[in-house]
Structures are given as structure tokens and as C-alpha cells.
Amino acid sequence: MKSAHMVAGYELRPSASWRIMTEAYYQKHYNIPIGPANTTTPFLLHNSQINEISGFVNDSLTSDGKGRSYGLELTIEKSLTNGIYLMSTTSIYQSKYTGRDGIERDSRFNGRFVQNILAGKEWKVGKNKTSIFAANIKLLAAGGNRTTPIDLEKSRTAGKTVYDWSKSYSEQLPHYFRTDARLSFTKNKKRTTSTISLDIQNVSNRLNAFDRYYELKKDKITLITQTGLLPILNYRLEF
């Protein structure tokens, strides 16, 4: 697979600690592996290697596929001053592909928007103000990945998940949302630096969607979700 990129950007610095950046981009993808010219297999006819997340397809492919993606990004950043830092990145985009059938479709990853916010505060503490207590938070919101409809009747007959590839990636999973928080204490000595931290991933315990499949025992389409809340305690000693 090959790509050609076009990017235009603008940067504004209203003060020494603030920076605002905008960027528009267009990417053209070509030589993407797709099904052979004479294929009648639905998966190969309507799909593209650009959508794969689990490795390569074990089929004969040709590099005739194409795709494109384009979007706008806005980044607002405040560098660390007075113990406070902030960065926000907003992206709106489109991601398309064209398979062997010649139809342009949404790619698996066409969530259409991503919002990242990272903020933190540091306090110098201790007798000589050489130790640092810090609190950080990170928020991520994004459009859900796209998925191919499951043919329920054919899945029942086959006893396993059967997709309707003629409608490849025409449906979208629920939007993704996750908040991570971190508290840390760093003690600086003459010859060593020690840090103890508590990271809480997915603070809201939201079970974000990953994919769907046909569950034979329950005779229904079931949503696969990702990991919920996960606390991680760390200690690091540097010499």
C-alpha cells in the first residue's frame, strides 16, 4: 500500500505559554490489496486490506484497491507554567476505501471525530520545594469504529457469525469515551529520584464497544466490550 499526502497548517502563539495550531490534510491511498478481478466471494468483493486489524487475509489478493482520508485538526496547547499545563486536540475526518466492486465505502476506522484533552497541575512541596506532587487527567472521546451488519438468519443456519459483506462497514458501533486519572509524588534527592503513582484507567468504568458477533447459545447478536476501570499502582526508583 502506498499513500500521497497533502497538508496545510497554521500556527498562532498568542503568548509565550499558549499555542494554537490548525491543520487540514488529504491522503490518497493506492496499491491497496483487494480481492482478485474474478472473485465472487463477498468478503473479497466488497472489502479491502485497509480495514484489517488482525493481520493479512489468507487469500489471493491484488494491489488494485484505493482509498482516501481527509480532515481538519485543531490543537490548543498551554505549556507548563505556574504548575499548570493543558492540551486539547480536536479532529474531524473522513476515511473511505474502494474495493473490487468499485463502490466507495466508509472504512472500518471512519469514526469521523476524535477529541483528546490532557490537563495537569504540579505542586512543589517539601522543605526545599524539591519534591513534586502532581495530578493529571486525560479524556478521550471518539466516534465508534464501523462494522459490517450480521446476517442473523444465515448465522443461525451456519451456527456461527455470518456477515452481510454487501453492506460492508455500513453500521457504526457506539461512540468511545474514556477518562484516565493519575496522582503522583516525586521525591528528588541528591543521588536518587523516587516516584510513587496511582493511575486509574477508565475512571467512569465505561464498557466501550469493540465488536459484535452471533452468540449461538443465546441465539442473538452480542456486543463485545473493552476493559472497564483499572487501577495501577507504580513505584519507580532512579539512580
Give names to the regions the model predicted.
Residues 25-28, 47, 51-129, 134-143:
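Gram-negative outer-membrane beta-barrel transporters
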Residues 3-4, 42, 53-61, 99-102, ...:
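Extracytoplasmic loops and strand-loop junctions of Gram-negative outer membrane beta-barrel proteins
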Residues 33-39, 46-47, 93, 97-104, ...:
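Outer-membrane beta-barrel translocator domains and adjoining extracellular loop/strand segments
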Residues 7-11, 23, 63, 73-75, ...:
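Outer-membrane beta-barrel architecture
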Residues 2-6, 66-70, 107-115, 131, ...:
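Residues that define the transmembrane beta-barrel architecture of outer-membrane proteins
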Residues 1-57, 205:
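Membrane-embedded beta-barrel scaffold of Gram-negative outer-membrane proteins
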Residues 2, 12-16, 28, 76-82, ...:
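Outer-membrane beta-barrel strand-turn architecture
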Residues 86, 138-160, 174-180, 185-239:
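C-terminal beta-signal and adjacent terminal beta-strands/loops
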